[in-house]
Regions:
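Ser/Thr-rich, low-complexity intrinsically disordered terminal regions
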Residues: 59-71, 115-138, 146
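Long, charged/polar, surface-exposed segments that mediate recognition or autoinhibition
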Residues: 75-124
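Short, Lys/Arg-enriched charge-dense amphipathic segments
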Residues: 60, 74-90, 134-151
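Alpha-helical protein-protein interaction elements
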Residues: 6-8, 50, 77, 88, ...
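N-terminal leader/targeting segments
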Residues: 1-75
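Tryptophan-centered motif/residue detector
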Residues: 58, 93-96, 156
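Extracellularly exposed regions in secreted/surface proteins, prominently low-complexity, repeat-rich
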Residues: 8, 13, 17-20, 124-172
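Functionally engaged cysteine thiol sites
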Residues: 67-72, 108, 154-163
């Protein structure tokens, strides 16, 4: 039944999203650029953490996934829940300030500048965590207790191809 129903469109939507939602996503970088930067950032962070924490070897533990954007639901934009990375070696409390600061410094180069939570006065008996956000809703989560873990979720973005299609279909 639902497959035959026409899609619900908002005012001014010509098939690619309402002007407000689509306009916001067209102004953002292409999803491909964001994902490439995310991968570079993770590579830099895991390399630095491996230097700080002896024996730390970061491995991709799962594949990522993507989902439509709630905030930009009329568009083809997607949020990418990146792969989960794990090091079997936890960050000791004595190294947590240095490790978490390294993550903050590297993430800032990629636009993740809003530190929303950071464990202070870490102990080896409690979970240590760091969460950093970017201006477009991206989130970097880094934590440690019995092992260390990291995942980066992007904000909502359109692919270059989706942007091209939307621009070509726009009323002239």
């Amino acid at each position: 039944m639902f497959d035959t129903m026409p899609p619900v469109k908002g005012e001014g939507d010509y098939g690619y999203g309402t002007p407000k939602e689509l306009g916001a996503l067209l102004a953002r970088r292409d999803a491909e650029e964001v994902l490439a930067d995310r991968d570079r950032m993770i590579t830099e962070i895991t390399a630095e953490l491996s230097q700080i924490v002896p024996g730390g070897n970061w491995l991709r533990d799962s594949e990522g996934t993507s989902t439509p954007c709630g905030e930009f639901g009329s568009t083809d934009g997607e949020i990418d829940f990146g792969p989960h990375y794990v090091s079997q070696i936890p960050v000791p409390a004595s190294l947590w300030p240095r490790a978490s600061q390294a993550v903050i410094d590297i993430a800032a180069k990629y636009g993740y500048t809003d530190v929303t939570s950071r464990t202070e006065n870490a102990t080896d008996e409690t979970h240590k965590d760091l969460t950093i956000r970017d201006a477009d809703g991206g989130r970097l989560a880094f934590g440690s207790l019995e092992a260390s873990t990291m995942q980066v979720t992007t904000g909502c973005y359109l692919t270059a191809e989706d942007k091209r299609k939307a621009r070509e279909a726009a009323p002239k």
